[in-house]
Structure formats: C-alpha cells, structure tokens
Amino acid sequence: MSSSAAEAREALATAVSVTADTLSVDLSDGRTVAVPLSWFPRRVHGTRAERDDWSLVGGGLGIHWPALDEDVSVEGLLVGRMSGESPQSLERWLQQRRVAG
C-alpha cells in the first residue's frame, strides 16, 4: 500500500460544510479538503436543507446525505474521486424528485 493510500485510510472526517459551490471536509489530522460541489450532481440539485443534512458514517470514514441518497468516502475525496453516478441514473433520480415534489 502506498503511503498516500495509508494516509487516506487513517484520515477521518470530523466536520462537513457545503456552500453553493464547494464541499469542505475537516479531517481528524488537521487538514481540510475542499472540492467543487459540481463533482457531486445530487448535491448540486439538492436544497440547502438537504445539503446540510449529513451524518458521519464508519466513525468518520465517510459522509452520508440521507435525503440525497448519497455517500462520499474521505479516501475518495483525498484521491480526487468524483461521483461515479451515470447520467442515466442521475436523470432517474431527478425524475423521482419531480414526481415526489
């Protein structure tokens, strides 16, 4: 395992902040990682309340947004992994939101 992979596995999320264009995650080792919100289309389409409704999972290994049905791992953020959701899956999710709304 590379040292960067080991660091990613050891870093835990402690706090999350979502602005109109950025997802920021504070880590247990003192770092803050910030990525464009556009990396995660469900959060882009979510309301402020939905974006702010998150919980840490796995003791801080990841973050879950229940209303957006999305999870992000700290490791993924640290290696620059964007959402892997297909455009078709995102469109189905958006359609379900329109029907429910």
Model-derived features: positions:
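Motif-centric detector for short Cys/His coordination patterns
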Residues: 1-101
